């Protein structure tokens, strides 16, 4: 009740402030974002040595209310909301509110392009860059839906770039200081050719109980060739990139290690059916995964957010269908098969449904 009253007071203050300014006008927008997620992992064929069999089955609702004020050159906005998630089969609704959403956004349009800055607790969906699953796995994208920090974006006719800061933890007795810097960009060189990059630097510092610092960095410059323009195909593309990593446990190693490799992704898309193959060739991009900090706590998924199979040769095949149901409804049904140098590891079946209903409200 207290949180709800605070939110109402904040919006009332913003509305009153805008009305007091000459020409001030607040545009209100109510948004409801619903996400249904089903992901069934079957890895018994490999003895669940790398990934365990299991199912993630959840429904997410993100209601938000936004207010925008038109300035001289910039549109200023404030958004308040909540991230609600229910895990199917759970016997309690107490954990339904997962995280609050509160962020400021400023958008400026120029002749060269559009710049947008965001600060606060904002949804990951505001980011538009491309990142390999070596950076973020499909499960991580679902479970870590919001960032706490800032986001900067620039879009021009043939160029896009973004940079984000996610402050994930403040140092305490048993709490680590953690923050992540992420960036991506795309340059449309020609109709069928684009160049780009993805970058991630993760600072995983120690707590008072377990001092020490671990640095994890990953950079992927890439190029993409898409032969679909001018044909009946939606996509006929080949993307190739070099994965360059930087790993350093400062308390246990005198110098960092720099394992790396190459990644190639081929995609065919027609009639909203996608067939995609991804192959990675190279070294172990997760060398500290099985390591522990000075208190004996494993690094594991606390240090690496990408797919677990990037420890050597890795091949993944995806087949999925994304039918067009409505403008605001997206459905995805698919299956993925995973191979490493040890052979067949397992497969997964996924269903995702997203309904994003944005409703402008009458301005004051």
Question: Model features per residue range: what roles?
Answer:
Residues 20-22, 49-53, 92-96, 107, ...:
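Outer-membrane beta-barrel proteins
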Residues 9-17:
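Hydrophobic h-region of N-terminal signal peptides that target proteins for export
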Residues 33, 156, 160-162, 168, ...:
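Exposed, low-structure sequence patches enriched in small/polar residues
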Residues 44-51, 92, 133-134, 295-302:
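Flexible, solvent-exposed loop segments that connect beta-strands
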Residues 1-4, 18-19:
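Positively charged n-region of N-terminal signal peptides that target proteins for export
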Residues 18-99, 106-110, 347-363:
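Beta-barrel outer-membrane channel/assembly domains of diderm bacteria
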Residues 116-186, 201-203:
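Surface-exposed coil loops of outer-membrane beta-barrel proteins
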Residues 23, 56, 67-73, 110-114, ...:
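A generic beta-sheet turn/junction motif
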